[in-house]
Amino acid sequence: MASSKLKYTRLSVSKLFYGFGLAAITLFSLQVSAQAKKSKPLVLKSGIYLKNITPDFKASTFRAEFYWWFIFENDSSKTGMSKEDILKVEFVNGIGVEANVFTNEIIYETHPAPNTYYITGFHQGDFYFTPDFRMYPFDKQQMDIILENGQFDSDQLVIVADTASFKRSKQDPNFKTLSNDILRKNNSRGFRIYKTDISESSILYNSDFGDISLEGNSSYGRLQYSVFIDRSILPYISKFVIPLMIILLLVYFVYFLPSDKIDTAAALTVTSLLSAIAFQSSINGDLPEIGYVIYVDKLFYISYFLIAVSMALSLWLFNLDLQSDNPANKEKSRKILLLARIFFPLIFISAVILFAL
């Protein structure tokens, strides 16, 4: 009898432990499942179709006109997100952009499936960008259109590119988002678009912005459309290279004048110097205030150096000519002129190549 009770007790304890284990496993599974659902952010697909883009280099801005669209799936009863909140996407580098810009610009909305949204609109406006003129006029620039939803962090919402649309449209991978109008007049506007890019990222804000309900460090998803441009070479050859070559050619003529023609040599060098200064001021007038030396400035500096050396050599050769009774001075003048004729273009060409590296 005692043995039967012992077996019954052991069986009851085993069932009890089994029940506790099963309950713990079930609870853990539910927690993991809930956590997985909670950690899965809403995916907001985005695309643009650029109709026009025009940079203003002096103001460090550009103007863009484009169609935009968003595609997303959302059951607000489960996510707690409304369509209006999801569309609170901002242009991070936009100028004078109103709040709820995308909601106000909607021109078409449809629902291809339950809780699925397709929304499109049109935007035209100005954007900031940071040009780099170090290699001007042979510089390359990057103009970005940056989207960010400041309402939900990256754990709740991420913005991704609608790459499927670009593939279906059979767009050139190097020119995604560009309209045929832009591509058709690509080389006729003083600059040339040589590629585009789309990148997804997140930005960390190390502030709660005074809201105690927020974490001190929050990450928000971003989508960046980039347009890369350079300048058409031929217009700048006629605008920059040819005038500077003419100025330096006038200075180079000094080395073919007789040593006693100091007045002609002085006139050529001084005129060339003043022309170079005025020319540099004219070119820099097309650029904003910048705090670094650009490529074209370096070419002008080497031009000033060559002009100054030419002026100094003219005076030296004139003084040697005054001592014409000394045959050694005539030979020295001849050698100096010969070396100057060789090194003058050599120094300038070397500087052009060296500064470009």
Question: Where is each model-derived feature located?
Answer:
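N-terminal secretory signal peptides that target proteins for export/translocation
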Residues: 1-14
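Low-complexity, intrinsically disordered segments with a bias for serine/threonine
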Residues: 8, 16-18, 33
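Bacterial N-terminal signal peptides
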Residues: 18-27
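N-terminal signal peptide c-region/cleavage motif recognized by signal peptidases
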Residues: 29-31
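Intrinsically disordered, low-complexity peripheral segments of secretory-pathway and membrane proteins
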Residues: 34-76, 83, 292-357
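Soluble non-transmembrane domains of integral membrane proteins
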Residues: 35-228
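Channel- or pocket-lining gating/hinge segments that regulate access to a cavity or pore
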Residues: 224-343
